[in-house]
Amino acid sequence: AEENKGNFVTRLEDGTYKRIVAAPKPQKIVELETIRTLVDAGQVVIAAGGGGIPVMEQGIDLHGASAIIEKDLTCGLLAEELNADTLLILTSVEKVSLNLDKADEEFLGGISVE
């Protein structure tokens, strides 16, 4: 059914199905100046998280893209554009991992900038 709509579906190892969508590298933050104004005014801003819909510019209009926001790259871009001293990523998982939900998933106990 989803394939007939132009969507891609894959079967996971546990037998369930998942719709596959693109997660393109973010190019820019659309509301950057609004966010900058709030930060400069001393407000706590929560932005660039999951659940948002990426958009594409078409002329002077913005149109939703059939994709997901790659939130780690997006918040990194936002921090860079704001010249942030600190980037704090909050998550509900016990540990960050590589290869999430795959047989070779590896949990990271700690990471450094080196």
Identify the role of each PLM range.
Residues 1-8, 12-44, 48-114:
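Active-site phosphate/oxyanion-binding loops
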